Amino acid sequence: NPNILVPLEKMTIEPEGGKSFQVLYNPESYTQSREVRYAQSQGISTNTPVVQFAGGGAESIQFKLFFDSMSSGSEVGGGVVDKAKFLGNSLLPSIGKLIDVRTYTNKVYKLMEIDPDKHVPPLVKLKWSTLQFKGFLVSCSIQFVRFSEQGTPLRAWMDCTFQEYISPDK
């Protein structure tokens, strides 16, 4: 396999004016979509409406991201500090696995918070190999699926939808 020598590139999320970060695991797939709008009006003396093009829509990308705070350091994204935490965490007995997965899911979830100075959430760039996407996080839901004995969330799936930003200049 010629790809065995190529290091795995992690998806990076770069919030405008904020600190960029890598996802812990790359998504298995993503869905890219775009819509156009058509207006319908009833024609005179016809059984079918008259259809007229009404405008284009922005592109959107949907991802399902996996987060696991019990992983070992070599298999996850993040910086050196994150990898060291994960490695140490994977060696602890179950009761000691206390890295709250929300530490990592909140980095994404907070991309929907409104910047008080700009009055909008931050514009983000998604970078993953040849995928380069600029837009806003418009929808996000988190399903927590594993917990420590104390009830701390340890694993989660996150469904995210990003909508393309189109500059008013274009």
What are these regions (language model features)?
Residues 1-170:
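Acidic, Ser/Thr- and Gly-enriched intrinsically disordered low-complexity segments
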